Swiss-Prot record:
GO biological process: translation
GO cellular component, one term: ribosome
SUPFAM superfamilies: Ribosomal protein S6
Gene: rpsF
Listed name of the protein: Small ribosomal subunit protein bS6
Length: 101
Protein backbone atom coordinates (compact mmCIF):
# COMPACT_ATOMS: atom_id res chain seq x y z
CA UNK A 1 0.00 0.00 0.00
CA UNK A 2 1.10 3.52 -0.77
CA UNK A 3 0.03 6.81 0.74
CA UNK A 4 -1.60 9.28 -1.66
CA UNK A 5 -3.00 12.80 -1.42
CA UNK A 6 -5.62 14.21 -3.77
CA UNK A 7 -6.48 17.90 -3.76
CA UNK A 8 -9.87 18.77 -5.25
CA UNK A 9 -11.20 22.12 -6.42
CA UNK A 10 -14.99 21.97 -6.26
CA UNK A 11 -17.58 24.29 -7.70
CA UNK A 12 -18.70 27.04 -5.31
CA UNK A 13 -22.28 26.33 -6.42
CA UNK A 14 -22.29 22.82 -4.88
CA UNK A 15 -24.47 22.62 -1.79
CA UNK A 16 -22.96 21.19 1.41
CA UNK A 17 -24.95 17.96 1.11
CA UNK A 18 -23.88 17.54 -2.53
CA UNK A 19 -20.23 18.01 -1.50
CA UNK A 20 -20.58 15.38 1.21
CA UNK A 21 -22.25 12.97 -1.22
CA UNK A 22 -19.42 13.48 -3.71
CA UNK A 23 -16.76 12.88 -1.06
CA UNK A 24 -18.69 9.85 0.18
CA UNK A 25 -18.60 8.43 -3.34
CA UNK A 26 -14.83 8.93 -3.57
CA UNK A 27 -14.35 7.38 -0.12
CA UNK A 28 -16.38 4.40 -1.28
CA UNK A 29 -14.17 4.01 -4.36
CA UNK A 30 -11.02 4.01 -2.20
CA UNK A 31 -12.46 1.40 0.16
CA UNK A 32 -13.80 -0.74 -2.70
CA UNK A 33 -10.26 -0.84 -4.13
CA UNK A 34 -8.92 -2.21 -0.79
CA UNK A 35 -7.75 1.22 0.37
CA UNK A 36 -8.32 3.20 3.55
CA UNK A 37 -9.09 6.89 4.02
CA UNK A 38 -6.68 8.61 6.39
CA UNK A 39 -8.00 12.19 6.35
CA UNK A 40 -10.40 14.51 4.55
CA UNK A 41 -9.56 18.16 5.20
CA UNK A 42 -12.08 20.78 4.12
CA UNK A 43 -10.10 23.93 3.34
CA UNK A 44 -13.28 25.80 2.49
CA UNK A 45 -14.10 28.51 -0.01
CA UNK A 46 -11.08 30.35 -1.39
CA UNK A 47 -10.46 33.03 -4.00
CA UNK A 48 -8.81 31.80 -7.19
CA UNK A 49 -5.92 33.53 -8.95
CA UNK A 50 -7.69 33.23 -12.30
CA UNK A 51 -11.18 32.24 -13.46
CA UNK A 52 -11.91 28.52 -13.64
CA UNK A 53 -15.07 27.74 -15.63
CA UNK A 54 -16.09 31.40 -15.17
CA UNK A 55 -15.79 31.26 -11.36
CA UNK A 56 -13.39 33.30 -9.22
CA UNK A 57 -13.98 31.22 -6.08
CA UNK A 58 -13.77 27.51 -5.37
CA UNK A 59 -14.12 25.04 -2.51
CA UNK A 60 -10.95 23.07 -1.70
CA UNK A 61 -10.86 19.57 -0.18
CA UNK A 62 -7.74 17.50 0.55
CA UNK A 63 -8.08 13.72 0.69
CA UNK A 64 -5.33 11.53 2.14
CA UNK A 65 -5.56 7.77 1.77
CA UNK A 66 -3.68 4.47 1.73
CA UNK A 67 -4.29 2.41 -1.39
CA UNK A 68 -2.61 0.18 -3.94
CA UNK A 69 -1.26 2.05 -6.96
CA UNK A 70 -3.98 0.73 -9.26
CA UNK A 71 -6.67 2.30 -7.08
CA UNK A 72 -5.55 5.83 -7.97
CA UNK A 73 -6.58 5.32 -11.60
CA UNK A 74 -10.09 4.33 -10.48
CA UNK A 75 -10.33 7.30 -8.08
CA UNK A 76 -9.24 9.70 -10.83
CA UNK A 77 -11.66 8.12 -13.32
CA UNK A 78 -14.52 8.76 -10.89
CA UNK A 79 -13.32 12.34 -10.37
CA UNK A 80 -13.28 12.98 -14.13
CA UNK A 81 -16.87 11.79 -14.62
CA UNK A 82 -18.23 13.67 -11.59
CA UNK A 83 -19.95 17.01 -12.05
CA UNK A 84 -18.88 19.81 -9.76
CA UNK A 85 -15.14 19.08 -9.67
CA UNK A 86 -13.20 21.76 -11.54
CA UNK A 87 -9.64 20.52 -11.04
CA UNK A 88 -7.69 17.90 -9.10
CA UNK A 89 -4.16 16.72 -8.51
CA UNK A 90 -2.95 13.46 -6.96
CA UNK A 91 0.53 12.95 -5.52
CA UNK A 92 2.21 9.96 -3.93
CA UNK A 93 3.30 10.81 -0.39
CA UNK A 94 5.08 7.57 0.53
CA UNK A 95 5.96 4.14 -0.85
CA UNK A 96 5.19 0.88 0.93
CA UNK A 97 3.42 2.25 4.00
CA UNK A 98 2.61 -0.44 6.54
CA UNK A 99 -0.99 -0.34 7.67
CA UNK A 100 -1.42 0.02 11.43
CA UNK A 101 -4.32 -1.99 12.86
Amino acid sequence: MRKFETLLLLSPELAADAREALLGTLTGVVEREQGKMVAADHWGMRDLAYPVQKHMRGYYVRLEYLAPGEAVAEVERNIRISDGIFKFVTVKLADAVEEVA
